[in-house]
Amino acid sequence: MGRLDGKVIVLTAAAQGIGRASALAFAREGAKVIATDINESKLQELESYRGIQTRVLDVTKKRQIDQFASEIERIDVLFNVAGFVHHGTILDCEEKDWDFSMNLNVRSMFLMIKAFLPKMLAQKSGNIINMSSVASSIKGVENRCVYSATKAAVIGLTKSVAADFIQQGIRCNCVCPGTVDTPSLQERIQARDNPKEALKTFLNRQKTGRFASAEEVALLCVYLASDESAYVTGNPVIIDGGWSL
């Protein structure tokens, strides 16, 4: 018996990183996983795993989301993972940077929840998990102005949905990681003028002396997706190795 037997889980940004690790972890625990991403080639790699089906989806496009939602008969868990990390202070951020991050990091979750929540309400049960960060309203982080603003908004969105629909059988939580070793992190490190120094800076702020793995975060997501967390809602759940202490 798996911890997620029989559950239908839809997640975004499943082609790599935390999304991919979570899709695999959900499937191992018996869930029927519908994994979405804009990256078709990487997404197709998941097709070989039992319990996972894939669908190309741009979460910034409302029409695509609404069409996708119309094709799904039942959903138990919605996991909104898609996001982008902008590097810099407010002075390094142009309006287009702000708009892009807000669109991908916040508006996409708004659109996904709006599309799938009615199905959950009709079922009188549903579970929404949003990807936030400790770089948000939890902790001020240098050179993460836009990113932190978007992730603070995700916490607010999460709490609002949880409060509004708690009596209709809906739960909503968000995951707040610290620094996670993902392809996205490695790309950001390599994009810096001095990648070796950038890696050192990232590691120096880790009180555990290491990054989290995507698989560690995925295990927390399994718990939040399962009935084991049935009494947990409206929470920003921190997994950061003590970084925010």
From Swiss-Prot:
Domain of life (superkingdom) = Eukaryota
List the disulfide bonds in this chain.
none
Q: Where in the cell is it found?
A: Cytoplasm
Give expression by tissue. Answer: Detected in liver, spleen and macrophages. Widely expressed.
Q: What happens when the gene is disrupted?
A: Mutant mice are born at the expected Mendelian frequency. They display microcytic and hypochromic anemia and iron overload in spleen and liver associated with heme toxicity when kept on high-iron diet. The plasma levels of ketone bodies is normal.
In terms of InterPro entries, this protein maps to: NAD(P)-bd_dom_sf, Sc_DH/Rdtase_CS, SDR_fam, SDR_superfamily_enzyme
List the SUPFAM superfamilies: NAD(P)-binding Rossmann-fold domains (SSF51735)
> What are its E.C. numbers?
1.1.1.-, 1.1.1.30, 1.1.1.104
Give the active-site positions: Y147
Keywords from the UniProt entry = Cytoplasm, Lipid metabolism, NAD, Oxidoreductase
What are its GO cellular component terms? cytoplasm; cytosol
Which residues bind substrate per the record? R144, R188, R205
Which GO molecular function annotation, any one, does this entry have? 3-hydroxybutyrate dehydrogenase activity
Q: What does this protein do?
A: NAD(H)-dependent dehydrogenase/reductase with a preference for cyclic substrates. Catalyzes stereoselective conversion of 4-oxo-L-proline to cis-4-hydroxy-L-proline, likely a detoxification mechanism for ketoprolines. Mediates the formation of 2,5-dihydroxybenzoate (2,5-DHBA), a siderophore that chelates free cytoplasmic iron and associates with LCN2, thereby regulating iron transport and homeostasis while protecting cells against free radical-induced oxidative stress. (Microbial infection) May play a role in susceptibility to bacterial infection by providing an assimilable source of iron that is exploited by pathogenic bacteria. Host iron-siderophore complexes can be used by bacteria to promote their own growth and pathogenicity.
- Stated family: Belongs to the short-chain dehydrogenases/reductases (SDR) family.
Subunit description: Homotetramer.
Q: What is this protein called?
A: Dehydrogenase/reductase SDR family member 6
Q: What organism does this protein naturally occur in?
A: Mus musculus
At the highest ranks, the source species' classification is: Eukaryota, Metazoa, Chordata, Craniata, Vertebrata
The gene for this chain is Bdh2
